[in-house]
Amino acid sequence: MPEFPEEFIAPMISSTVTMLILVWLIFARAAQRLSLALWVGLALLVWLAAVLLLSPHGFFLKLSLHPIPNIGLLFVPMIIGINFLAKSVVFQKLVDNIYQPWLIGVQISRMMGMIFLTLYARGLMPAEFAFPSGIGDIVVGITAPVIAAILFFNLPFSRILAIGWNIIGFADLVAAIILGFLTSPTPYQFLALDNPNYFLFDFPLALVPLFAVPLSLLLHIFSLRVLLKQASISRDYLTQE
């Protein structure tokens, strides 16, 4: 098995920590109680710490959860987040209070997808994963501040554009997860058989699929909830007039 380039380890960790801090600041600004902001921060820290502790030595490629590889654990934070959004009134209010331009703008962190193309150029990642996932993330990351600015200035059709952008960004991540499963050395590998995706679920690259990707998916869901709710209220208001 080839070795992961050491020069990318520090940037991967720092980028992920920066994303965590920015997301926490966004939630802390929306929280009406300090205790709620602290709980959100603690949850993010525990999540990141778990990935950092478990990702070395190929833990997420093992089959102790057979027939589902340990990489199936990436769905746990998403399930927890969606469950809170569906059942917790306090969390629903927190999400509704988040400033949308910030929630969308923070997805500039998706530029981390450039690492996939860099690894492909070095022959360390299969094209079947690197191209669609890397290019998709870069496009979403570049357009994130643009969509955030359009929302900030409340330009015409800004909400529709933001909804469409969120859907595209969400679909890109879902496709990346599927391709990650299909190209990694697990029982579900059907692509890149001659060049398996060894690094994707190992340290430090595991920070992307096991922290950044699920967190970004949740941010898309939170944003869509608020934007669709606002669109529904606007339609009702226009109908009453």
Regions found by a protein language model. Give the residues of each.
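Early transmembrane hairpin module of multi-pass membrane proteins
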Residues: 9, 37-81, 88-91, 95
